[in-house]
Curated annotation (Swiss-Prot):
<comment type="function">
    <text>Catalyzes the first step in hexosamine metabolism, converting fructose-6P into glucosamine-6P using glutamine as a nitrogen source.</text>
</comment>
<dbReference type="GO" id="GO:0004360">
    <property type="term" value="F:glutamine-fructose-6-phosphate transaminase (isomerizing) activity"/>
</dbReference>
<dbReference type="InterPro" id="IPR035490">
    <property type="entry name" value="GlmS/FrlB_SIS"/>
</dbReference>
<keyword id="KW-0032">Aminotransferase</keyword>
<dbReference type="GO" id="GO:0097367">
    <property type="term" value="F:carbohydrate derivative binding"/>
</dbReference>
<feature type="domain" description="SIS 1">
    <location>
        <begin position="291"/>
        <end position="430"/>
    </location>
</feature>
<dbReference type="InterPro" id="IPR001347">
    <property type="entry name" value="SIS_dom"/>
</dbReference>
<dbReference type="InterPro" id="IPR046348">
    <property type="entry name" value="SIS_dom_sf"/>
</dbReference>
<keyword id="KW-0963">Cytoplasm</keyword>
<dbReference type="GO" id="GO:0006002">
    <property type="term" value="P:fructose 6-phosphate metabolic process"/>
</dbReference>
<dbReference type="GO" id="GO:0006047">
    <property type="term" value="P:UDP-N-acetylglucosamine metabolic process"/>
</dbReference>
<dbReference type="GO" id="GO:0006487">
    <property type="term" value="P:protein N-linked glycosylation"/>
</dbReference>
<dbReference type="GO" id="GO:0005829">
    <property type="term" value="C:cytosol"/>
</dbReference>
<dbReference type="Pfam" id="PF13522">
    <property type="entry name" value="GATase_6"/>
</dbReference>
<feature type="domain" description="Glutamine amidotransferase type-2">
    <location>
        <begin position="2"/>
        <end position="221"/>
    </location>
</feature>
<protein>
    <recommendedName>
        <fullName>Glutamine--fructose-6-phosphate aminotransferase [isomerizing]</fullName>
        <ecNumber>2.6.1.16</ecNumber>
    </recommendedName>
</protein>
<dbReference type="InterPro" id="IPR017932">
    <property type="entry name" value="GATase_2_dom"/>
</dbReference>
């Protein structure tokens, strides 16, 4: 959600800040703004509703001088999207300017107290309350900005990542975090600040990830200072970012989403590199081997995740239960954290998150840890909060995912879950050796089969034109394909704004069949694995009610192709690996329908890439 960028050094701040905001556009936003300490020591704030490009147009005739500044993209939580509610926010004296990502839960109480003391508010945001509170602490207690920030944050309930400028101390930025990510980049006589490393990698590969409760004091020409809310000095741990600048560009594709769909064969190969020994037909996840006893002796696994990651978790449940014979529960992290779950030291919790910053998933991890559970993380963003909070885990190594609608992260998560299940099953002795070797060999062939699927791009682009009229879609699948149906429906609704729902195919008769008529497209995953004959019966039921069937079938299928309105043939694979093949054409179908409808595919309305608030 909201993006934060900051700079202090010798260069002009504004171009760095604007470029940084553009790097963070993928996080989702509805307004943008910038605050600069100008060459003549003025604190200038400029902000607008809309895209970063609109902010650029707005400041054309403004004073954008200065080598110190902060900038922000806002995703509305308190107050509608408008320039008044956009960040940065001034304090009453206009000597302080603050940007904030997160939610101040007790803002209403704090606002009433400040209003009683004569403070006037221009916006309806919780962020303006925070900057006014900091100024109140600074003036009333006659303290410096750092102390005022510490005093104010000790009164705050909620999540925050903040950066603040003080006109009276133009050589300094104060930044702090709690339950919302913040990264400090360290350059040569300059510092960078951002919500994640993407705006920083162009300038430096040395970063410090702030921990919860830490405050960074960033001064020009001085060493980075990190303290906690009690002013105890911390030792910042400098890490190297492995991110490459080229990974953040479209590379000739019209959208990041299409690029990321086409990257999947290479991404899955990278995900498996060093983990699958092709010659020995063996899968080894070091995280499993290192904690073998804990994992093998677990009484159950609990997978916590949100959105697309939750769909991957459903596939993980099927894999682990089938291969390892360990019971698995899959929970929405947002529900798990609030329902007082029964959990103890005999449980293993698998936390899945692309960004590693998903607020509900992170909170679920902390809850499970507090009750003695062993935590295994599956994330993409290296150095993010969830990997730092877990006992062990596996990165999916698919590279940065910029498109808001997840594609390669999903298949990467499924790949890691497959390798996790296979490694555990072999260690546990619950999988037949012949079956194990067949799956490992087939898993190694998946990148090549994904490339075959991508050759269907033009056919799916043409097919999509037929269905732009639709207001509703139904997606059906059985077994491993049911979570794929859910994911396909989610992709369509996210980027095309067409209402779509996924169901287990057998559940169609328990309600959804009432919706089927000549205007209802039904996507059916009907590969020749497992329950093919039953899915065939479901298709016949749909056609009997004049529904439009788009069937994804195994290459060579001659039965369903005669019944369906359209059939797309896919390479054959083993049933448990079907999701890695069948997901890709559903991503392409959703993408092309959205493009045909003229939608903003990479930044769909109301959505954020990294959901860092509840």
């Amino acid at each position: 959600m909201c993006g934060i960028v900051g700079y202090i050094g010798k260069r002009k701040a504004y171009p760095i800040l604007i470029k940084g905001l553009k790097r963070l556009e993928y996080r989702g936003y509805d307004s943008a703004g910038v605050a600069l300490i100008s060459d003549n020591q003025q604190l200038n704030v400029y902000k607008t509703k809309g895209k970063v490009s609109e902010l650029e147009n707005f400041v054309t005739q403004k004073d954008i001088s200065g080598t110190v500044g902060i900038a922000h993209t806002r995703w509305a939580t308190h107050g509608e999207p408008c320039s008044v509610n956009a960040h940065p926010h001034y304090s009453s004296s206009e000597k302080l300017a603050l940007i904030h990502n997160g939610i101040i839960e007790n803002y209403a109480v704090l606002k009433e107290k400040l209003q009683a003391k004569g403070y006037v508010f221009k916006s309806s945001t919780d962020t303006e309350v925070l900057v006014q509170l900091i100024e109140y602490m600074k003036v009333t207690n006659r303290v410096d900005l750092l102390t005022a920030v510490q005093l104010a944050l000790n009164e705050v309930i909620g999540a925050y990542a903040i950066a603040i400028l003080d006109k009276e101390h133009p050589e300094e930025i104060i930044a702090a975090r709690k339950s919302s990510p913040l990264v400090v980049g360290i350059g040569e006589d300059e510092f960078f600040l951002a919500s994640d490393a993407t705006p920083i990698v162009e300038y430096t590969d040395k970063v410090v990830y702030l921990e919860d409760g830490e405050i960074a004091v960033i001064n020009r020409g001085k060493e980075l200072k990190v303290v906690d809310l009690s002013n105890v000095e911390m030792t910042p741990e400098v890490k190297k970012v492995e991110l490459k600048l080229g990974q953040l560009e479209k590379g000739g594709y019209p959208h990041f989403m299409l690029k990321e769909i086409f990257e999947q064969p290479d991404c899955i190969h990278d995900c498996m590199r060093g983990r699958i020994n092709v010659e020995a037909n063996n899968v080894v996840l070091s995280a499993v081997i290192d904690y073998k006893e804990k994992l093998l002796n677990a009484k159950r696994f609990i997978i916590v995740a949100c959105g697309t990651s939750w769909h991957a978790g459903l596939i993980g449940k099927h894999l682990i239960e089938s291969f390892c014979r360990i019971p698995v529960e899959v929970e929405y992290a947002s529900e798990f954290r609030y329902r007082d779950p029964v959990i103890d030291e005999h449980d293993v919790v698998i936390a899945i998150s692309q960004s590693g910053e998903t607020a509900d998933t992170l909170a679920a991890v902390e809850l499970a840890k507090s009750r003695g559970a062993f935590i295994y993380g599956i994330c993409n963003a290296i150095g993010s909060s969830i990997p730092r909070a877990t006992h062990t885990g596996s990165y999916i190594h698919v590279g940065p995912e910029i498109g808001v609608a997840s594609t390669k992260a999903f298949t990467g998560q499924v790949t890691v879950l497959t390798m996790l299940a296979l490694t555990l099953a072999r260690e546990k002795g619950t999988i037949d050796e012949t079956q194990y070797l067949n799956i490992v060999r087939e898993l190694n062939s998946i990148p090549g089969k994904m490339k075959e699927v991508l050759k269907l791009n033009d056919k799916l682009a043409e097919l999509s034109k037929t269905f732009t009229y639709a207001h509703n879609f139904i997606y059906l699948g059985r077994g491993y394909s049911y979570p794929v149906a859910l994911e396909g429906a989610l992709k369509l609704k996210e980027i095309s704004y067409i209402h779509a729902e996924g169901y287990p195919a057998a559940e169609m008769k328990h309600g959804p069949i009432a919706l089927i008529d000549a205007e209802m497209p039904v996507v059916v995953i009907a590969t020749q694995n497992g329950l093919y004959e039953k899915v065939l019966s479901n298709i016949q039921e749909i056609k009997a009610r004049k529904g439009k069937v788009i069937a994804f079938v195994t290459k060579g299928d001659t039965v369903i192709s005669k019944i369906a309105d359209c059939s797309i043939e896919l390479p054959e694979t083993i049933e448990c690996l079907d999701p890695l093949i069948t997901t890709v054409p559903l991503q392409l179908l959703a993408y092309h329908i959205a493009v045909c409808k003229g939608m903003d595919v990479d930044q769909p309305r109301n959505l954020a890439k990294s959901v860092t608030v509840e």
